[in-house]
Amino acid sequence: MAQLGKLLKEQKYDRQLRLWGDHGQEALESAHVCLINATATGTEILKNLVLPGIGSFTIIDGNQVSGEDAGNNFFLQRSSIGKNRAEAAMEFLQELNSDVSGSFVEESPENLLDNDPSFFCRFTVVVATQLPESTSLRLADVLWNSQIPLLICRTYGLVGYMRIIIKEHPVIESHPDNALEDLRLDKPFPELREHFQSYDLDHMEKKDHSHTPWIVIIAKYLAQWYSETNGRIPKTYKEKEDFRDLIRQGILKNENGAPEDEENFEEAIKNVNTALNTTQIPSSIEDIFNDDRCINITKQTPSFWILARALKEFVAKEGQGNLPVRGTIPDMIADSGKYIKLQNVYREKAKKDAAAVGNHVAKLLQSIGQAPESISEKELKLLCSNSAFLRVVRCRSLAEEYGLDTINKDEIISSMDNPDNEIVLYLMLRAVDRFHKQQGRYPGVSNYQVEEDIGKLKSCLTGFLQEYGLSVMVKDDYVHEFCRYGAAEPHTIAAFLGGAAAQEVIKIITKQFVIFNNTYIYSGMSQTSATFQL
C-alpha cells in the first residue's frame, strides 16, 4: 500500500521531481507558508505553491470580500462577498490539492504585529502582498531579526514588484544553465591516467576503434600534443584547430585511403573546447572559502558553512588545489563496456573524494562538540557533486534600503542613464507610498480624483527624490500613468507575478536554484523586467 502511495505521488509530481528531486519535494512538503492578504496577487502565489504540494499554508487577512475582490480574484466568487477574505480564499485554494493543509487567521497584520509579533516567526517563509509601507517595514524588521525569509509582492496597475528580504541564503544545488563538465583532462588523477594508458588506438580492431569514448580519444591525442609542444595545452583558436587536425588524422582509412565513418572521432573533434577547459576553483568558491563564517566555525555555525570549511581543507590537502571530482560524464558514442568502465573511474574517484571531505566534516563536528550525524551523508554527497556551483545570497534589510544614509543611490542613479529604465517604476512606487501616508489613500482611486492627484503625486515624487539626494529626472508621463492606475490590481499582472513569486518561494524552501538579490520590477507596459540590489 505504501509502495502504491509512493508511485501515485511520483506520477502526480513527475515534472517537478525531475527539477528538484525527492529531497527538494520533501522540503516543500514540510514547509509552512504564510500569506498576508488574500488579494489577487496573493492567491495566485498560493495557487502556484499549493499545486506542487507545499505542506501547509496560513492566510492572514482581516478584510471582508468586496465586489471588487470578486471581480479581480479568480479564487473569490460573488457568493463570497461579505465573508472573511482569508477564509473564502482558503476554501477554494484547498480544492486544488488534497495533500495540502490550509488555515486562516481573521485578523489584520497590523493587529498581529501590535499584539503578537512572534506569531510570524513560526513559518518557513512569509509572503506579504499589497501592504502599506509602514506595515512592510515593521514586518520586515521582526522577520529579519528572527531570520525568517520574507517576500514582499505588489501589483500596482501594470507594474509588478517583488522584494526578497533574507539575511543569508546558502545554495548547494544552484543548477547553473551552462555548467562545464568536470573531466580533468588537463590534470588527470592517477586512476584516470592509468585508464587512458590501457588504450592503444594504433593496434585496435576497427569495431573497438570506432567505439572508444571521445574522452579517451582526446586524452590520447593530448598526450601526443604535449610531447610535441613541451607540455603546453592548446589555448588559442589556432592551437585548438591544429589539435582538431591531429585528432582527424587518427581516423581509420579504408583500402582506398578514404577516411572511415567514425562518429566517435567526430564527437571528439566537436568536444575539444569542452574537454580543454582548465580545472580551477571558481572565484565565487574562493570567496566562500575566505568568508568569516567559513574561517570561524563555532557550535552555532550552520551545516552549510561546516561543509564549506571541510571542502576548503580537502582542497588544501587531498585535493592538491582542486575541488572533489564531480563523478559524472556526458553521454557519448561508445560501446556499453567501455563507457561503463570510464564512468566507474570517475565515480570511484568521486566517492573517494567525498569520503575525504567527510573525514574533515567529522573532525570539525568533533572540535565544536557536535554529533557526527548532525550532517548526513546525503548532504555531504550533494555538496561534493555541486562543489563548483555553491552560492551564498545576502540581501540588504528593508530598513537599510529605506534609510537616508544607507539607500543604494549608486544603483538607482546608474540605472537612470536610461530615463525609461524599470528603476523609474520603483521610484514611482515609493512616491505613491508617500502619497498614501499623507492622504490616507492612493492617487486616482476615484475617477474624479485623477486630475487633481497628478500635482499631489508629482509633489510627493519631488519630495522623495530631494529627501534622499537623488538627482534624477522622472518624466511626467509616469506620474500621469500612476494616477490613472488608481492602485488597481489587474488579474493579468497579478497572475504573472504570482508565478514568478512562487518560483522564488520554492527556491528558498528547497535551497535549490538561485534567488534574485533583492528587488524585481516587472513592467506590463513594455513587458520587460529587471532586478536591482537596493
Curated annotation (Swiss-Prot):
The record marks 211 as: Interaction with UBA3. Pathway: Protein modification; protein neddylation. The keyword Ubl conjugation applies. Residues 331-344 are annotated as: Interaction with UBA3. The modification N-acetylalanine is found at residue 2. Ubiquitous in fetal tissues. Expressed throughout the adult brain. Gene3D superfamilies: NAD(P)-binding Rossmann-like Domain. Keywords: Acetylation, Apoptosis, Cell cycle, Cell membrane, Disease variant, Intellectual disability, Membrane, Ubl conjugation, Ubl conjugation pathway. Heterodimer of UBA3 and NAE1. The complex binds NEDD8 and UBE2M. Binds APP and TP53BP2. Belongs to the ubiquitin-activating E1 family. ULA1 subfamily. This is NEDD8-activating enzyme E1 regulatory subunit. It comes from Homo sapiens (Human). The lineage of its organism: Eukaryota, Metazoa, Chordata, Craniata, Vertebrata. The gene is NAE1.
